[in-house]
Swiss-Prot record:
GO biological process terms held by the UniProt record: rRNA 5'-end processing
Name of the protein in question: Putative pre-16S rRNA nuclease
Source organism per UniProt: Pseudomonas fluorescens (strain ATCC BAA-477 / NRRL B-23932 / Pf-5)
Family: Belongs to the YqgF nuclease family.
Compartments it resides in: Cytoplasm
Gene3D superfamilies: YqgF/RNase H-like domain
Gene Ontology CC: cytosol
NCBIfam families attached to this UniProt entry: RNAse_H_YqgF
């Protein structure tokens, strides 16, 4: 199955960043940030995104430790990925998201600065775009089959 459109998720316990990527261009861009309560999103909002974008797959970021070992959040992120698959029957992939939030904050500053706190003006969607871009770059061969 050719993957044409992919949604990327930067999973968090309070917010989940969402990005969209196109195989034809090999580019990802930020889409939105969903609120979560203790890691549980509003599944109706997730369903609306799935129905609107009709992704061929989803990519969920894995927050690995700097040494490459799984962090405590990895278990929750993988569970979120499995739930996306179970609820919406969409294939999922995971991708190392180390330093994407740090890089997203730097990108936000480069775009003209941060207005207020990161809680009020989150960078999660930027981080989702960065992790999805990394996945697209690493899986270009898979996308064009």
């Amino acid at each position: 199955m050719a993957l044409r459109l992919i949604l990327g998720f930067d999973y968090g316990t309070k917010q989940i960043g969402v990005a969209v990527g196109q195989a034809i261009t090999g580019q990802a861009r930020e889409l939105c940030t969903l609120k979560a309560q203790n890691g549980v999103p509003d599944w109706n909002q997730v369903e609306a995104l799935i129905k609107e974008w009709k992704p061929d797959a989803v990519v969920v970021g894995l927050p690995l430790n700097m040494d490459g070992s799984p962090s405590d959040m990895c278990v929750r992120a993988e569970k979120f990925a499995r739930r996306l698959n179970g609820r919406f029957n969409v294939p999922f992939y995971t991708h190392d998201e180390r330093l994407t939030t740090f890089e997203a904050k730097g990108e936000r500053l480069a775009r003209g600065g941060q207005k207020g706190s990161y809680r009020d003006n989150p960078v999660d969607a930027i981080a989702a775009a960065l992790l999805l871009q990394g996945w697209l770059d690493e899986n270009a061969g898979l996308l064009n089959t």
